[in-house]
Amino acid sequence: QPDCKNYRPLNIYGQSKLLGEQAVANTLDKYFIVRIAWVFGRNGKNFIKTMLTVGKNHDKLTVVNDQIGTPTYTFDLARLLIDMAESEKYGYYHVTNEGGYISWYDFTKEIFRQAVALGHTEYDEDHITVTPVTTAEYGASKAARPFNSRLDKSKLIQAGFTPLPDWKDALQRYLTEILNEEF
């Protein structure tokens, strides 16, 4: 639940986010704190752009299959944030696109599947093999990552906000926008 106070950040980054949330909540009476996960959008780096770049340059990829979550498209998120700002339904919220949770491996497979459907055959299974591995098999990363990044969005619905579209739809819209550009 978004209002749960049983926090356990895994790293310094998570700790700093929590301290920021607490500073806002302890200072203001009216605030929105919106927690998101697996964010992708037009600007900056993200997992999708990384997989597309790696997929162009390698014929074999290994991707973790034991970390799960749900993607969040910044375009969809921005529309919701406008709706929230125009309301007085303050508090903590969890937001991701709808469509259920997936692993990073499943997400990669769907990225490539949709890219092929949009005419980019360089991402088909004849050109790229994607192999699932555990986090332990993949090796060390820069920071500890949660195995379960699912967020409970029930408060968002109870407050009357419209849920974000399905993540597969969001991915399709995003890929349509970026695939013919250099990223």
Give names to the regions the model predicted.
Residues L10-Y13, F40, D66, Y93:
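Catalytic tyrosine of NAD(P)H-dependent dehydrogenase/reductases that use a Tyr as the general acid/base
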Residues R42-N43, Q67-D76, T96-Q114, R173:
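Substrate-binding strand-loop-helix patch
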Residues S16:
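Active-site helix of classical SDR
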Residues Q22-D76, D83:
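NAD(P)-dependent short-chain dehydrogenase/reductase
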Residues L77, L81, V95, F107, ...:
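Non-catalytic, hydrophobic alpha-helical segments
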Residues S87-S141, F183:
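Mid/C-terminal beta-alpha module of Rossmann-like enzyme folds, strongest
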Residues Q1-L10:
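Active-site "gating" loop of Rossmann-like NAD(P)-dependent oxidoreductase/epimerase domains
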Residues I157, D166-F183:
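Amphipathic terminal alpha-helices
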